[in-house]
């Protein structure tokens, strides 16, 4: 039963990471208006994020192979949080882009370790449950995270 708390934490983490990934999609028009640019130019924020995750995954994982998984997960969450705060405080598009690349780096490592970590904390008889819970965080982010993120973004500005 001890595995439930970390597993729920990992599920919530997948929700937060994916909501963060999807949120700019719902706010693209507002981002473009805030930085006085076209929506297609602001859309590079989403494309560069996706490319950064793809390109950084393998090199970053090669750099952190010796870091214990729990410490690595906590470090990734700290990096993610700091870069999200920098995103919120961005005064221009390029600062926002740099912060989002930092989030993408955290995202790349997060998705490389979260599923094996979920299976590791659960008893072997509950491995499929652990994987489905982590996957549920993604589904809930798509269904509720994106619209809630849009509402939050519009409310805060």
What is each model feature region?
Residues 55-91:
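Conserved MFS/SLC helix-loop-helix module at the cytosolic interface between two early adjacent transmembrane helices
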Residues 99-137:
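Cytoplasmic helix-loop-helix junction between adjacent transmembrane helices
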Residues 95, 133-157:
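Helix-loop-helix hairpin linking two adjacent transmembrane segments in secondary transporters
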């Amino acid at each position: 039963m001890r595995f439930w708390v970390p597993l729920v934490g990992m599920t919530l983490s997948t929700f937060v990471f994916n909501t963060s990934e999807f949120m700019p999609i719902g706010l693209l028009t507002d981002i473009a208006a805030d930085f006085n640019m076209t929506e297609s130019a602001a859309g590079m924020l989403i494309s560069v994020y996706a490319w950064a995750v793809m390109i950084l995954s393998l090199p970053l994982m090669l750099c952190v192979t010796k870091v214990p998984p729990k410490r690595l997960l906590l470090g990734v969450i700290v990096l993610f949080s700091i870069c999200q705060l920098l995103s919120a405080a961005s005064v221009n598009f390029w600062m926002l882009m740099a912060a989002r690349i930092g989030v993408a780096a955290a995202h790349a490592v997060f998705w490389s370790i979260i599923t094996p970590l979920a299976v590791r904390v659960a008893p072997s008889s509950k491995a499929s449950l652990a994987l489905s819970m982590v996957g549920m965080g993604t589904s809930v982010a798509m269904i509720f995270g994106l619209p809630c993120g849009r509402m939050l973004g519009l409310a805060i500005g």
